[in-house]
């Protein structure tokens, strides 16, 4: 079985994330969306809230599961669940520069490969941080987030 991990904080999930997860589901038998919980970071949504929003959004995608990932190494999480690959979306060259050293270390530690999927052009400018900022200032982000996330941002889970 070919299992891949799509890791991230997903705070919040946006349509760029969903598009990468859906493409990964077409490439692998199973995709685990690993929701990170780094105690050094401050999140808008709890892990449980993020998981619920992701599950509501990807429920129609065959072979996709959502799991929390603790503060440990991603490579170790992959080893524990038997993942063959890590899937990362890339919005541009800066993302690759950031991701490449981590991919090399993950491969060194456990042999897990990182597969990069270029972002859909509609979402190359979208990030979770930008979504939170624009929404917080009263901007309309409905075009960029799934319905479950928009409800969460508007105060109703």
Swiss-Prot record:
Q: Which HAMAP family does its entry note?
A: PPAT_bact (MF_00151)
Catalytic activity, per the record?
Answer: (R)-4'-phosphopantetheine + ATP + H(+) = 3'-dephospho-CoA + diphosphate
Q: Name one GO cellular component term.
A: cytoplasm
Secretion signal span? none
Q: Which Enzyme Commission number(s) are on file for it?
A: 2.7.7.3
List localization entries. Cytoplasm
* One Pfam family matching this protein: CTP_transf_like
What Gene Ontology biological process does one annotation of this record name?
coenzyme A biosynthetic process
**The organism's taxonomic lineage, starting at the top:** Bacteria, Bacillati, Actinomycetota, Actinomycetes, Micrococcales
Sites annotated Transition state stabilizer: 17
Q: Tell me, how does this one assemble? A: Homohexamer.
The record's GO molecular-function terms, alphabetically, read: ATP binding; pantetheine-phosphate adenylyltransferase activity
The family assignment reads: Belongs to the bacterial CoaD family.
Instruction: Provide this UniProt record's keywords sorted from A to Z.
Output: ATP-binding, Coenzyme A biosynthesis, Cytoplasm, Magnesium, Nucleotide-binding, Nucleotidyltransferase, Transferase
Under the heading PANTHER family, the entry gives: PHOSPHOPANTETHEINE ADENYLYLTRANSFERASE (PTHR21342:SF1)
Superkingdom classification of source? Bacteria
Stored Gene3D superfamilies: HUPs (3.40.50.620)
**What protein does this entry describe?**
Phosphopantetheine adenylyltransferase
Q: What does this protein do?
A: Reversibly transfers an adenylyl group from ATP to 4'-phosphopantetheine, yielding dephospho-CoA (dPCoA) and pyrophosphate.
Q: Where does substrate bind?
A: 9, 41, 74, 88
Query: Where along this sequence does the record place binding of ATP?
Result: 9-10, 17, 89-91, 99, 123-129
Q: Which cofactor does it need?
A: Mg(2+)
Q: In which pathway does it act?
A: Cofactor biosynthesis; coenzyme A biosynthesis; CoA from (R)-pantothenate: step 4/5
């Amino acid at each position: 079985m070919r299992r891949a991990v799509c890791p991230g904080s997903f705070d919040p999930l946006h349509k760029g994330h969903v598009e990468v997860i859906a493409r990964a589901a077409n490439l692998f038998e199973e995709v685990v969306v690993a929701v990170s919980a780094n105690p050094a970071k401050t999140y808008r949504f709890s892990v449980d809230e993020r998981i619920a929003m992701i599950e509501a959004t990807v429920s129609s995608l065959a072979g996709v599961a959502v799991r929390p990932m603790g503060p440990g190494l991603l490579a170790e999480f992959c080893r524990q669940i038997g993942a063959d690959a890590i899937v990362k979306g890339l919005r541009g060259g800066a993302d690759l520069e950031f991701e490449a050293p981590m991919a090399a270390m993950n491969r060194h530690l456990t042999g897990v490969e990182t597969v990069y999927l270029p972002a859909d052009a509609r979402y190359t400018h979208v990030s979770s941080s930008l979504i939170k900022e624009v929404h917080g200032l009263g901007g309309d982000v409905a075009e960029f987030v799934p319905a479950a996330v928009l409800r969460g941002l508007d105060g109703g889970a």
